[in-house]
Swiss-Prot record:
A Pfam family of this chain: DUF16
Domain of life (superkingdom): Bacteria
InterPro entries: DUF16
Name of protein: UPF0134 protein MPN_524
Signal peptide: none
Protein species of origin: Mycoplasma pneumoniae (strain ATCC 29342 / M129 / Subtype 1)
SUPFAM superfamilies per record: MPN010-like
Family: Belongs to the UPF0134 family.
Length: 168
């Protein structure tokens, strides 16, 4: 005796036990069910066949319309989200371009600062050399002042001698 089961259960049964275990051919009925040998159903302890419930054309149309409405809502939502994503992608690209420009500007600023630092270093070296020269010049001036002081002392002595000579 053959029993009716759904197409889905039939395919599951075929996957589970393999086609070679069936003695008969698959029989398709007009209501979407298929027939298989009852022995195979009992052997593999499958659930009893599903009873098929019929719906009217009007009920099916209502179901279809409600699904269409849900799909339209989903499509609208997805379209809006897609638009938002597209806008965000454009904003990200703009930000990347702006960030790249800022990076280049920052590089130029850093290069300028480096050049200024190099110039300041050179000026510092020159200032150090000038300070050394100033120190040497101060040393020379000190020597000259010492000589001048010595010369003044000598001149004072000479003046005293001259005064002595004149007074005589």
């Amino acid at each position: 005796m053959k029993e009716k089961i759904s197409e889905k259960e039939y395919k599951a049964l075929i996957r589970k036990i393999g086609k070679e275990h069936f003695d008969g051919e698959k029989e398709e009925y007009g209501d979407g069910t298929v027939g298989v040998w009852t022995y195979e159903l009992r052997k593999y302890k499958l659930k009893p066949p599903v009873k098929v419930k019929y719906v009217t054309q009007e009920q099916f149309q209502e179901y279809k319309d409600s699904n269409n409405q849900r799909l339209i809502k989903i499509e609208t939502t997805l379209a809006a989200q897609g638009e938002q994503i597209r806008i965000q992608v454009e904003q990200i690209k703009e930000l990347q371009i702006e960030q790249k420009a800022q990076g280049e500007t920052l590089k130029l600023i850093l290069q300028t600062l480096q050049k200024m630092s190099d110039r300041l270093d050179k000026m510092e070296v020159k200032m150090d050399k000038m300070e050394e020269k100033m120190d040497k010049m101060e040393g020379k001036i000190d020597k000259i002042e010492n000589r001048m002081d010595k010369m003044e002392v000598k001149m004072d002595k000479m003046e005293k001698r001259i005064d002595k000579l004149e007074s005589k």
